[in-house]
Amino acid sequence: MRYALIASMLGQAAISVAMPSEPAHSPRAAGAQAYASNQAGNYKLTSIAAPVQGNGSPGPSTWNLSIDDTSSGYKQKIVGFGAAVTDATVSAFNELSASTLSQLLDELMTGAGASFSLMRHTIGASDLSGDPAYTYDDNGGNADPGMTGFNLGDRGTAMATMLAQMKGLNSNLQIFGSPWSAPGWMKLNNAIDGNTNNNNLNDGYLTNNGAQYSAAFAQYFVKYIQAFESHGATINAITLQNEPLNSQAGYPTMYMFSYEQGDLIQNYVAPALKAAGLSTKIWAYDHNTDQPDFPEQVMGIAADDVSAVAWHCYATNLDWTVLTNFHNSYPNTDQYMTECWTPSTGAWNQAASFTMGPLQNWARGVAAWTLGTTAQDGPHLSSGGCGTCTGLVTINNGQYTFQTAYYMMAQFSKFMPVGATVLSGTGSYTYSGSGGVQSVASLNPDGTRTVVIENTFGNDIYIHLSTSSGQEWSGNVPTNSVTTWVLPAV
């Protein structure tokens, strides 16, 4: 849960940077290329000296990396990178003129900028919604198991419309939705907001009074998916509950047990989607890496109906190798990093690290929290809203600014296209408190290879890269930067 961990996650201040410097030429052009974004802000997807074959001219600090770009090194295929489209995002973006919004979306969704192809969105209100909190079937607090009062409302319609615009710019875009709470009338506490007692779905799991609203909960997803599709926003996947182990008060939350989630998926939500002719996939969990038993227990019940597991970054002792352990147990189940915040006071490389770590450990995609906010980190709920959640993009006085986190994520998304295959590699290491080098590589559909290198040392590092295909590449990686090499096809 992001708020309890603010103090432990803050670091050096992020820099606010303006429009991106476009690479001088296409990342798919002949020959090796290199692009960098850094803490200082003078590199923003900037073309720098490309690596050369052989040893080159090593500097005083060198580091060896290796990748297996043969079939024996193939790992997961990339689905994409992006962020959460929240009510705050939609509201902030819609402050822009039509022409400025068009330019912004083009930079987010196409090769003109980040080429984002994975977007999460909030089903109803989240902590990054303006007052009041809402769902798509509040019905005045009255029970509505037949969903006769279902309505996206102005905010849901605006969100669906914006997601459809994004899909129109990038046909590869995958959209997944997550609710922060079921409608209050479906819950034991009869409220959208969380609390310490009865902040649970009224599905009989705690009360032994029958399924109650389990079927209605499933139909809520069906209605929402159909409504968004009617606006041109296809929903590719859902999670049943954002942060199911979070029952925090002050904003929409809902506690959900692992066995409860497994039962809901197997006996209600999956059958309802199938009966409605929907191909939307179900992702389990959607919470931190410190409770891996939760998704494992869900898989024990509903493995046939779960296509992926979703993870967040807020564990006190964050360890992305949990994803590798899960992969070893469930090699046919996809994994995604679906939420990590990007506060303006966070470490410069925070977004790079929460993208790098999951990719090294079998994640097929990464989504930050959140895509866009105002310069005041909102709009957000007045009670319990996140007042320090800065978007990858901030909107102020009719203009937009890309934050450091945007560039860090774009170092991956722009150069690791949909369908790229992540490669196994060696040489990544971070010293406790004194920097290090982390890397991840991919074999792209056109045969080129991408190597993303994160240097957290206070000096440049000369990288020597060996490939299993028999090549040697060398080049400089600037201090406190994320640098991407694009190597030609073998």
Swiss-Prot record:
Task: Cite a single GO BP annotation.
Answer: polysaccharide metabolic process
Q: How does activity depend on pH?
A: Optimum pH is 5.0. At least 20% of maximum activity is retained between pH 4.0 and 7.0.
Give the EC number(s) under which this enzyme is classified.
3.2.1.75
An example molecular function term from Gene Ontology annotations? glucan endo-1,6-beta-glucosidase activity
Signal peptide coordinates: 1-28
According to its UniProt record, where is this protein mainly located? secreted
One cellular component term (GO) for this entry is:
membrane
Question: What is the protein name stated in its UniProt record?
Answer: Endo-1,6-beta-D-glucanase BGN16.3
Name the source organism.
Trichoderma harzianum
Taxonomic lineage from the root? Eukaryota, Fungi, Dikarya, Ascomycota, Pezizomycotina
